[in-house]
Amino acid sequence: MLKYLNARVASSPCLLLVVVLLVLTSSTSCSLFGTHKKVSIPPLLPRVNGTREQMIQEVNRLASIKSIHGKLDIQFEDTSFASFGIAEKYRQVDGNLTLQRPGKIFLALQFTIVDIAQMASDGEHFAVAILQGDEKYKRFVKGTNSAVYSRLDRNGDSAPATNSKQKGEKQTVSALSNLRPQHLTDAFMIRPIDLNAGFIYSLSEFFQEEADTRPNKKGSRVMRGYYLLEELSAPKDGETSVLRRFWFDRVDRIRLARLQTFDGRGQIVTDVSYFDEKPIGSGETVSLPSRIELTRPQDQYKISLSYQDPTSVDLNKDWPPQAFVLQNKWQLPEVDLDAEKPKKLTSNQ
């Protein structure tokens, strides 16, 4: 019998392997499976549950704001070299902002109490006046909101800055020369969700590891839960596309934390993050984000905007149409972007 078993084992490598494994596991099972090592992982923050209807209601609450007027701290980052892990952050400037639905904006920018730029849009067309910096930057630019333009040409020699103030001013003007006023309108004045507009809305959850922003938790990492509410186009030929993606933070309560918009190719047009929600308004207050970060990957910039004094912001005031008209009273050289080349229209600008 022993000879028969030995013969079977010798003739079957698979059977031999099984026998060896049985011997090993029977003699070392305790040490093999009893050994363990504790590792630290980011804790999952407590989260609340919500419904699609609740999130749509929150978007439309924010979208109920008709106008905003207030002073801002604005910081601009040029992300042209983001693929190399480099971004240029420019000096903070002061902004005087007026917004009104639908899509109207006026923004005046100052650097150390000097006017450096003004820009406006009536919802269809925009104008930007660059008032400081090198002569190659001083100009009055006009265009159409729904058009896509390449970055303005910055070629040309410039005189070296004689001090740090001049250097900071030149860098800031250079960075702001390609900012378009209509880029800010949807970030502040979110478009409402209309369930009768033919769009499809899909809800899912998402978990993301990120820095812990709670007090006394500097340097820590946490796992934060989100709801993703996606606005999809009506199906056509069996296909649909994402138009907007709303991120809702689930920690403590349901809060709109991020909004992404997409073009027809599925590429991100705008990526807006909302922070530090608090009562905003000089009279009747509304709970709104007090800091907004807007990233435009295709335009290669990021801009951070914070209210200087949330209690002095005017909400829901009616502004006349002329408040959003910018005239070239400085007699700057004019650049008509529509006249230089045919404009390419897109539906997600």
Annotate each language-model stretch with its function.
Residues 1-11:
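N-terminal secretory signal peptides that target proteins for export/translocation
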Residues 13-27:
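Bacterial N-terminal signal peptides
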Residues 30-90, 168-178, 339-349:
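N-terminal leader/targeting segments and the immediate start of mature chains
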Residues 31-34, 177, 191-194, 198-331, ...:
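Gly/Pro-enriched, hydrophobic low-complexity segments
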Residues 32, 74-126, 132-133, 345-346:
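Post-signal peptide N-terminal segment of secreted/secretory-pathway proteins
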Residues 59-68, 88-90, 98-102, 119-121, ...:
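Edge/loop elements at the starts and ends of beta-strands within beta-rich repeat scaffolds
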Residues 102-183:
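An acidic-aromatic
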